[in-house]
Regions:
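Domain-level signal for soluble alpha/beta catalytic cores
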Residues: 1-194
Length: 194
Protein backbone atom coordinates (compact mmCIF):
# COMPACT_ATOMS: atom_id res chain seq x y z
CA UNK A 1 0.00 0.00 0.00
CA UNK A 2 1.34 3.41 -0.98
CA UNK A 3 1.07 6.25 1.54
CA UNK A 4 2.21 9.53 0.00
CA UNK A 5 4.11 11.79 2.37
CA UNK A 6 3.85 15.57 1.94
CA UNK A 7 5.08 18.55 3.90
CA UNK A 8 2.05 19.88 5.74
CA UNK A 9 0.66 23.27 4.72
CA UNK A 10 1.42 24.94 8.04
CA UNK A 11 5.04 23.78 8.16
CA UNK A 12 5.48 24.86 4.55
CA UNK A 13 4.19 28.37 5.25
CA UNK A 14 5.79 28.71 8.69
CA UNK A 15 9.16 27.96 7.09
CA UNK A 16 8.63 30.30 4.14
CA UNK A 17 9.80 33.89 3.92
CA UNK A 18 8.01 36.78 2.27
CA UNK A 19 9.48 37.78 -1.07
CA UNK A 20 11.41 41.02 -1.13
CA UNK A 21 9.05 43.79 -2.15
CA UNK A 22 5.98 42.11 -0.62
CA UNK A 23 3.35 44.44 0.83
CA UNK A 24 4.07 45.81 4.30
CA UNK A 25 2.98 43.33 7.00
CA UNK A 26 2.56 40.40 4.58
CA UNK A 27 3.52 36.97 5.90
CA UNK A 28 3.37 33.66 4.03
CA UNK A 29 0.63 32.54 6.44
CA UNK A 30 -1.60 35.14 4.78
CA UNK A 31 -1.83 32.66 1.89
CA UNK A 32 -3.03 29.77 4.07
CA UNK A 33 -6.54 29.67 2.57
CA UNK A 34 -5.05 29.33 -0.92
CA UNK A 35 -2.79 26.52 0.27
CA UNK A 36 -5.69 24.71 1.95
CA UNK A 37 -7.58 24.77 -1.37
CA UNK A 38 -4.51 23.42 -3.17
CA UNK A 39 -4.09 20.63 -0.60
CA UNK A 40 -7.80 19.78 -0.93
CA UNK A 41 -7.27 19.35 -4.68
CA UNK A 42 -4.20 17.18 -4.14
CA UNK A 43 -6.08 15.00 -1.64
CA UNK A 44 -8.98 14.60 -4.08
CA UNK A 45 -6.56 13.59 -6.86
CA UNK A 46 -4.88 11.06 -4.57
CA UNK A 47 -8.26 9.60 -3.60
CA UNK A 48 -9.21 9.34 -7.28
CA UNK A 49 -6.07 7.26 -7.81
CA UNK A 50 -6.99 4.86 -5.04
CA UNK A 51 -4.71 6.19 -2.30
CA UNK A 52 -6.17 5.22 1.08
CA UNK A 53 -3.86 7.18 3.41
CA UNK A 54 -1.77 10.35 3.10
CA UNK A 55 0.85 11.54 5.58
CA UNK A 56 1.22 15.27 6.17
CA UNK A 57 4.39 16.14 8.09
CA UNK A 58 4.05 19.12 10.43
CA UNK A 59 7.32 19.53 12.37
CA UNK A 60 6.69 23.28 12.21
CA UNK A 61 3.98 22.81 14.83
CA UNK A 62 6.52 21.58 17.40
CA UNK A 63 8.99 24.47 17.41
CA UNK A 64 8.86 27.90 19.01
CA UNK A 65 7.87 30.76 16.73
CA UNK A 66 7.39 34.51 16.94
CA UNK A 67 3.69 33.78 16.53
CA UNK A 68 1.79 32.98 19.75
CA UNK A 69 1.15 29.25 20.22
CA UNK A 70 -2.59 29.89 20.57
CA UNK A 71 -2.65 31.54 17.12
CA UNK A 72 -0.82 28.59 15.54
CA UNK A 73 -3.19 26.17 17.29
CA UNK A 74 -6.17 28.03 15.83
CA UNK A 75 -4.59 27.90 12.35
CA UNK A 76 -3.99 24.15 12.82
CA UNK A 77 -7.62 23.62 13.83
CA UNK A 78 -8.90 25.67 10.88
CA UNK A 79 -6.55 24.05 8.34
CA UNK A 80 -7.11 20.43 9.29
CA UNK A 81 -10.84 20.87 9.88
CA UNK A 82 -11.11 22.13 6.29
CA UNK A 83 -9.00 19.26 4.93
CA UNK A 84 -10.85 16.62 6.97
CA UNK A 85 -14.25 18.02 5.96
CA UNK A 86 -13.65 17.02 2.35
CA UNK A 87 -15.47 13.78 1.58
CA UNK A 88 -13.35 12.81 -1.42
CA UNK A 89 -9.97 12.28 0.22
CA UNK A 90 -7.70 9.64 1.70
CA UNK A 91 -7.47 9.20 5.46
CA UNK A 92 -5.13 11.81 6.94
CA UNK A 93 -2.16 11.07 9.22
CA UNK A 94 -0.50 14.21 10.61
CA UNK A 95 3.02 13.70 11.98
CA UNK A 96 4.77 15.90 14.53
CA UNK A 97 8.42 14.87 14.75
CA UNK A 98 11.15 16.63 16.74
CA UNK A 99 9.10 18.08 19.57
CA UNK A 100 5.92 18.64 21.54
CA UNK A 101 2.71 19.82 19.90
CA UNK A 102 1.64 21.72 23.04
CA UNK A 103 -1.60 23.64 22.26
CA UNK A 104 -1.69 22.10 18.80
CA UNK A 105 -2.50 18.63 20.19
CA UNK A 106 -6.08 19.33 21.32
CA UNK A 107 -6.60 21.52 18.26
CA UNK A 108 -5.64 18.69 15.89
CA UNK A 109 -7.65 16.08 17.80
CA UNK A 110 -10.72 18.25 17.21
CA UNK A 111 -10.46 18.38 13.40
CA UNK A 112 -11.67 15.04 12.04
CA UNK A 113 -8.28 13.68 10.94
CA UNK A 114 -7.91 9.92 11.29
CA UNK A 115 -4.45 9.63 12.89
CA UNK A 116 -1.93 11.82 14.70
CA UNK A 117 1.73 10.97 15.27
CA UNK A 118 3.48 12.11 18.45
CA UNK A 119 7.25 12.09 18.94
CA UNK A 120 7.47 10.24 22.26
CA UNK A 121 11.28 10.08 22.19
CA UNK A 122 12.26 13.76 22.24
CA UNK A 123 9.37 14.97 24.39
CA UNK A 124 7.07 13.79 27.15
CA UNK A 125 3.31 13.93 27.00
CA UNK A 126 1.27 13.56 30.17
CA UNK A 127 -1.34 10.84 30.61
CA UNK A 128 -4.16 13.34 30.10
CA UNK A 129 -2.84 14.25 26.64
CA UNK A 130 -2.61 10.60 25.63
CA UNK A 131 -6.04 9.79 27.06
CA UNK A 132 -7.51 12.57 24.90
CA UNK A 133 -7.02 10.29 21.89
CA UNK A 134 -9.58 7.84 23.27
CA UNK A 135 -12.35 10.43 23.33
CA UNK A 136 -11.41 11.91 19.95
CA UNK A 137 -11.52 8.71 17.91
CA UNK A 138 -8.14 9.66 16.40
CA UNK A 139 -5.56 6.88 16.20
CA UNK A 140 -2.42 7.64 18.21
CA UNK A 141 0.66 6.88 16.13
CA UNK A 142 3.20 6.57 18.93
CA UNK A 143 6.62 7.66 17.72
CA UNK A 144 8.28 5.46 20.31
CA UNK A 145 11.28 4.09 18.38
CA UNK A 146 14.11 6.62 18.11
CA UNK A 147 14.18 7.57 14.43
CA UNK A 148 17.83 8.53 14.64
CA UNK A 149 18.91 5.21 16.13
CA UNK A 150 16.42 2.46 15.38
CA UNK A 151 19.01 -0.19 16.23
CA UNK A 152 18.72 0.36 19.99
CA UNK A 153 15.33 -0.11 21.55
CA UNK A 154 14.19 -2.00 24.62
CA UNK A 155 11.14 -3.55 22.97
CA UNK A 156 9.87 -5.18 26.17
CA UNK A 157 9.89 -1.87 28.05
CA UNK A 158 8.36 -0.16 25.04
CA UNK A 159 5.56 -2.70 24.82
CA UNK A 160 4.87 -2.33 28.55
CA UNK A 161 4.72 1.48 28.27
CA UNK A 162 2.42 1.36 25.25
CA UNK A 163 0.08 -1.13 26.92
CA UNK A 164 -0.35 1.36 29.76
CA UNK A 165 -1.62 4.13 27.48
CA UNK A 166 -5.25 4.64 28.40
CA UNK A 167 -6.33 5.69 24.96
CA UNK A 168 -8.03 4.36 21.90
CA UNK A 169 -6.30 2.81 18.92
CA UNK A 170 -2.49 2.92 19.02
CA UNK A 171 0.01 2.27 16.23
CA UNK A 172 3.78 2.25 16.76
CA UNK A 173 6.21 4.17 14.57
CA UNK A 174 9.61 5.82 14.65
CA UNK A 175 9.79 9.20 16.36
CA UNK A 176 11.15 10.89 13.24
CA UNK A 177 11.74 10.22 9.59
CA UNK A 178 14.19 7.41 8.91
CA UNK A 179 16.32 9.68 6.72
CA UNK A 180 18.96 9.74 9.47
CA UNK A 181 19.33 5.96 9.57
CA UNK A 182 22.60 4.68 8.07
CA UNK A 183 22.49 2.38 5.10
CA UNK A 184 25.41 0.26 6.30
CA UNK A 185 25.80 -0.87 9.91
CA UNK A 186 29.47 -1.69 9.28
CA UNK A 187 30.16 2.06 9.22
CA UNK A 188 28.47 2.70 12.57
CA UNK A 189 29.98 2.94 16.04
CA UNK A 190 29.55 -0.52 17.63
CA UNK A 191 28.27 1.13 20.83
CA UNK A 192 25.22 2.34 18.90
CA UNK A 193 24.37 -1.02 17.35
CA UNK A 194 22.92 -3.97 19.30
Amino acid sequence: TVRPQLVGPLTLLLGAKAEQGSPEGFTPLDRLDDFVKAYQQVLAELAARGVQWVQLDEPGLTVDRDIPNAKIAELARKTYSALAAETNRPAILVTSPYGNLRENLPALLDTGIEALHLDLVSTLYNAEALTAFKDSGVTLVAGAINGRNIWRADLRALLHALQNINGGAVAVASSTSLQHVPHDLDLEDPADVP
